[in-house]
């Protein structure tokens, strides 16, 4: 983040404007936004504020954020710390005219010591119930939902899809966290597009797997699945 001085930010912003590119930022899921320890609490707040400031300098249209993670015996206190911290970040984003997108993260085995937040439908709903702002919307990662017991359909039917700004796409084996190239796992992408597009979704899709070449190639596969469902494509 320190490398983004005024000169670099100006060049990136000008390049996006010149080529008609839409730029978004994505914070690291490894940074624990549910931090409760002295010094680290303040650092987590500063981390989010700095991303918001950077988005303004770059002209980025959104910032994907995460709820952090908890350990075995501290779920309640860390979840509330996470919600409170994101609430503070949203208040700052409102002042800076920045848009935050909260991502649903992947579930871990039930007996795992560490668990991400939010990692299921109920937790995702809770975050949006406690933080209501036009500057906080949902980034729906479908491969995380795919190996949840309720699946992609359960999330689409259970969430208020008017909150959804971004759909993050990768294939998955239905068993554990892995971002696979579309067509190599068992996600039914035709059905995924049908569910999401029929929900009134008006946001953007974002590939999240492999290399840049993998994602460009995967884009063509995904477009074919969408066309098979009769979904109009704007090139």
Can you name each region flagged by the protein language model?
Residues 21, 98, 201:
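Short phosphate-binding/catalytic loops that engage adenosine nucleotides
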Residues 1-57, 129, 133-135, 153, ...:
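N-terminal pre-domain/capping segments
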Residues 7-20, 85-92, 154-155, 191-195:
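Catalytic-core regions built around general acid/base machinery
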Residues 17-18, 34-137, 147:
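Active-site acidic/histidine proton-transfer and metal-coordination neighborhood
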Residues 61, 112, 121-235:
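Histidine-acidic metal/acid-base catalytic patches
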Residues 27-31, 67-71, 104-108, 142-146, ...:
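Active-site-proximal loop/turn and secondary-structure-junction residues that shape catalytic pockets
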Residues 4-7, 34-36, 108, 183-185, ...:
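Surface-exposed loop/turn and secondary-structure junction residues enriched for glycine/proline
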């Amino acid at each position: 983040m320190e490398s983004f001085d005024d000169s670099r930010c100006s060049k990136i912003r000008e390049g996006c404007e010149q080529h008609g590119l839409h730029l978004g930022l994505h914070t690291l899921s490894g940074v624990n936004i549910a931090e409760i320890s002295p010094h680290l609490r303040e650092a987590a707040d500063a981390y989010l504020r700095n991303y918001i400031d950077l988005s303004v300098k770059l002209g980025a249209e959104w910032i994907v954020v995460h709820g952090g993670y908890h350990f075995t015996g501290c779920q309640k206190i860390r979840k509330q710390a996470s919600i409170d911290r994101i609430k503070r970040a949203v208040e700052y984003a409102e002042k800076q005219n920045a848009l935050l997108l909260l991502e649903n993260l992947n579930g871990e085995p039930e007996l795992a010591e560490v668990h991400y937040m939010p990692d299921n439908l109920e937790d995702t709903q809770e975050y949006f119930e406690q933080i209501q702002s036009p500057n906080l919307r949902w980034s729906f990662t479908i491969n995380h939902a795919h190996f949840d017991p309720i699946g992609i359909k359960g999330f689409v039917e259970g969430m208020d899809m008017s909150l959804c700004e971004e759909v993050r796409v990768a294939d998955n084996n239905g068993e554990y966290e892995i971002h696979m190239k579309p067509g190599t796992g068992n996600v039914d992408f035709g059905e995924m597009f049908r569910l999401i597009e029929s929900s009134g979704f008006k946001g953007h899709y974002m590939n999240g797997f492999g290399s840049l070449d993998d994602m460009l190639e995967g884009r063509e596969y995904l477009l074919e699945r969408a066309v098979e469902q009769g979904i109009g494509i704007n090139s």
